[in-house]
């Protein structure tokens, strides 16, 4: 799976890349929200990990843009933040974030959250396949015509 990282802090970005690559992910790392948005529009990412506070475009605005972007597949978004207040959490969820990881990064916590993301993405892919393969039933009778 290819993951887009948006993190302006070089040390945090390098740590994220190292952890993710060690886990076998393909990583595209960007230094701010503007670069991340451009990369997102050019590539196909099922997972985005973004810092909240960044120059150019912050993580919340990046999240909003991703949610408004027309694409065929759902993108799971994990926000990274040093802000841990309820207001910050709710604002992120309202912007469209799926999950949060707090700084400083804990590799074990990140791995656990990535496993959750993979399960949800896999479920969504399976559900999309089911929708295409199986037309809805009407009153217990298949809607296919013979």
State the predicted function of each range.
Residues 24-31, 39:
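Short hydrophobic/Thr-rich beta-strand motif most characteristic of the beta2 strand and flanking loop
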Residues 43-49:
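Active-site beta3 strand of CheY-like receiver
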Residues 14-22:
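Charged docking surfaces used in two-component/phosphorelay signaling
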Residues 54:
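Receiver (REC) domain active-site loop signature in two-component systems and cognate sites
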Residues 105-118:
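C-terminal output helix
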